[in-house]
Amino acid sequence: MCIRDRLEIYSLYDLIYYFPYKYVDRSRIYYIHEIDGNMPYIQLKGEILGFETIGEGRQRRLTAHFSDGTGIVDLVWFQGIKYILGKYKLHEEYIIFGKPTVFNGRINVAHPDIDKPDDLKLSSVGLQPYYNTTEKMKRSFLNSHAIEKMMATVIQQIQEPLPETLSPKILSDHHLMPLTEALRNIHFPTNPDSLRRAQYRLKFEELFYVQLNILRYAKDRQRRYRGYIFERVGDVFNTFYSQNLPFQLTGAQKRVLKEIRNDVGSGRQMNRLLQGDVGSGKTLVALMSMLLALDNGFQACMMAPTEILANQHYETIKELLFGMDIRVELLTGSIKGKKREAILTGLLTGDVKILIGTHAVIEDTVNFSSLGLVVIDEQHRFGVAQRARLWTKNIQPPHVLVMTATPIPRTLAMTLYGDLDVSVIDELPPGRKPITTIHQFDNRRESMYRAVRKQIEEGRQVYIVYPLIKESEKIDLKNLEEGYQHILEEFPGCTVAKVHGKMKSAEKDEQMQLFISGQAQIMVATTVIEVGVNVPNASVMIIENAERFGLSQLHQLRGRVGRGAEQSYCILVTNYKLTEDTRKRLEIMVRTNDGFEIAEADLKLRGPGDLEGTQQSGIAFDLKIANLARDGQLLQYVRSIAEDIVDNDPSAQSPENKILWRQLKSLRKTNVNWAAIS
């Protein structure tokens, strides 16, 4: 077992930047007569009086009776028994550290850290660092304690100060600890204040370079790429506004539309992120932006991640443009032959004004006459390279409007999309009622079904979402196939549609149409219906095993209902065995419908690396010490410093700033330039 195989540590640099995830105070040695099984950790000095092996095979365990003269505790190992017996001797002095428990009336410490007093030196004194490891590493005795000892050896070898990665001015102006001192103290802090200062220095540097990278690229893009100028609001836009607009725009929609008009009329390329909760009217704003492109002689394109969503956008936009002489086409992987050829020809001649599609629109055979605006819906579901290909369909890049119904916390948006201008639609169209969310345990299913029957009798429709398609031997969860049969039996007079990710597209679309048209009263599905499906008549969303879903996913699923004028309900069904984090998630869902509040809570509970879509960014997983949920203020602070540098010295003429650009260049070798393309 090698450390590089499990933790991607290939050099001393990687090792020294592998930071502890927590620290435990080891400044005190207890006497055995002082301790009890409720203490979080204990540290004892004493000797092993004897060893005892109990059980056979997998049940085998080794117990060492350890004493300091005031009492006896049992040290217990379930693995590595031969190694332990060979390494530790009877009646020699050791310091042991671990978590106490009580078993058969005696204090036990399972798999403790054990050191000879003379071996402690840098490690295991004061605040002890703890490093993340895997179970396989622990079985090979490459545990946190082993990494700590390796780290102590490396730190002791640093005789000369390491080259600085921040300029003297930044270090001085912001009272930052020198790099070498910070690295020593992050691994082996001399006291809590030294640890705090080391963490601050390293977080500052990490977030500073993230922002410097984003802002420098944004500045460079503005310099290199001019945008098409949409000078006029013409007949197309005005006709739609006066004759086809389905309802009055909300104040938020008007504000966002004004921001977009300012962008496309400015002469610089628009690169804007449009956030809006489910049902907030983003598609209407996107359509009106596309009509501005048409008024100025350009084409527009909208790309969606799935055929279902692309079809839905196509039908919605065709309906909104009814009676207007605008050719709108749909291009997906399933459209072939003469129909496809006609669409491609229409794009080249300019007859096709608006193209809506999936990733099929980025294929090499798809070329436009004059593409002026690209709208990317649910963009986190596309890879960076896919988005880039659409962005480069013209010699001069088109304006880009990125839409998401997955609200992104402000700190995360600054990190992932810091080079984009951000617009937020933060109000729902008039007449929408807040969705009532209920947490219900599995054993109250009959009362839930009675409520569902009442909704169906009143003409409403119901979604039921399952975490699995088929039964699993590994986990005991509700699954769609069994659920489908159960629902058929429970609701004999109803038509039940079924959709999951392993169905062929044609079959999936057929089942979706059954539900969309109202022929099916109930749809059982997996999370394939999470994004974009719009059935205003659906008023109930039941999520089975809701404890298996993250906050963001629960919120997206809930957003499939509440799209009509009637009261809607979301029922979160779970068993009784829930973790504390799960209880918190469910309480948040019951308490609020606000997607941004939910996104902030999700960031705090899960961290940025786990949030849906951040994996595409190439940055969430690269943060070694900063935490976007906790370090939002620091992020804003370093962003202002980076902005000042980029604005005043964009070409790094100042000797002070050369070190910054040099360090940024070395960091960027390992990072994708995701900032370029939303």
Model-assigned labels for residue ranges:
Residues M1-R6:
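Conserved small/polar residues in nucleotide/adenosyl-binding loops
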Residues M512-I522, I529-P536, M541-E544, G559, ...:
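Accessory helical-bundle/CTD segments and flexible terminal tails appended to RecA-like ATPase motors
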Residues Y228-L274:
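Conserved pre-motif I regulatory segment
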Residues R255-K258, Q269-E587:
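Inter-lobe coupling/hinge segments of SF2-like helicase ATPases
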